[in-house]
Amino acid sequence: MSFEVLEQLESKIQTAVDTITLLQMEVEELKEDKVKLETEANELRSQREELEQKSQQAQQEHAQWQERIRALLGKMDEVE
């Protein structure tokens, strides 16, 4: 009977070891996924910042053109 108990214990220990091994593999996969997601998030942040800079530059250029047009219209009014 004691041999049967040892076999059951061995089986339970093996199941626990297998479960731990699977969980360790899962943890490693999750760590890899985390690194990939962090990299992707950093790339997206960088792209967003670049787009914000381009947008700001376009707005500044737009404002400059509006000012030039106003100046030209003002000169045209003076001529008339």
UniProtKB/Swiss-Prot annotation:
Keywords: Cell cycle, Cell division, Coiled coil, Cytoplasm, Septation. Its main location: cytoplasm. Disulfide bonds: none annotated. Residues 41-60 are annotated as: Disordered. Residues 3-80 form a coiled coil. Residues 41-53 have a biased composition (Basic and acidic residues). GO terms for cellular component: cytoplasm. It comes from the Bacteria. GO terms for biological process: division septum assembly; FtsZ-dependent cytokinesis. Non-essential, abundant cell division factor that is required for proper Z-ring formation. It is recruited early to the divisome by direct interaction with FtsZ, stimulating Z-ring assembly and thereby promoting cell division earlier in the cell cycle. Its recruitment to the Z-ring requires functional FtsA or ZipA. Homodimer. The ends of the coiled-coil dimer bind to each other, forming polymers. Interacts with FtsZ. Belongs to the ZapB family. HAMAP family: ZapB. This is Cell division protein ZapB. The lineage of its organism: Bacteria, Pseudomonadati, Pseudomonadota, Gammaproteobacteria, Vibrionales. The gene is zapB.
